[in-house]
Amino acid sequence: MSRRHSAEKREIIPDAKYGDVVLTKFMNSIMYEGKKSTAERIVYGAFDIVENRARANPIEVFRAALDNVAPAIEVRSRRVGGATYQVPVEVRTERRQALAIRWLIQAARGRNDRTMIERLSAELLDAANNRGNAVKKREDTHRMAEANRAFSHYRW
């Protein structure tokens, strides 16, 4: 990793149906091997199911799910005098969003429903209602940070 220049931020085009940049990032994270149309089909299909089940705007359910999954604090390893400490640090906004997206997708892929569309819709609904594996992951992260609060003075 070069120390001279940080990578330029690429402009992300909002998705066609809802005009949301975060949703495009979500689709890009779901995408395998450059198959964007498949990723779009999965996300829009899941949004249709969410709309039918929750009787709510799917983009609002999506945003609520992301907010409920995004961690506020995490632990990072810090080596001090031969010992490695897990130091709690606040999470930057971009990383919060990236982690929330990653955890939602991992939790959806880990479910036992038939299709990815069903799995994703179920995980989105669960996360919006503060349930599910993605929310559990965030709570575990917060618990870890709370347990290591004694080392917070090693923050950098």
UniProtKB/Swiss-Prot annotation:
Record flagged with keyword Ion transport: no
**GO terms for biological process, alphabetical:** translation
Keyword tags: Ribonucleoprotein, Ribosomal protein, RNA-binding, rRNA-binding, tRNA-binding
For this record, the Gene Ontology CC terms, alphabetical, are: small ribosomal subunit
Q: Kindly name one Pfam family recorded for this protein.
A: Ribosomal_S7
Q: Which SUPFAM superfamilies match?
A: Ribosomal protein S7 (SSF47973)
Q: Partners and quaternary state?
A: Part of the 30S ribosomal subunit. Contacts proteins S9 and S11.
Report the HAMAP family cross-referenced here. Ribosomal_uS7_B
Q: What does this protein do?
A: One of the primary rRNA binding proteins, it binds directly to 16S rRNA where it nucleates assembly of the head domain of the 30S subunit. Is located at the subunit interface close to the decoding center, probably blocks exit of the E-site tRNA.
Q: Write down what this protein is called.
A: Small ribosomal subunit protein uS7
Q: Which gene encodes it?
A: rpsG
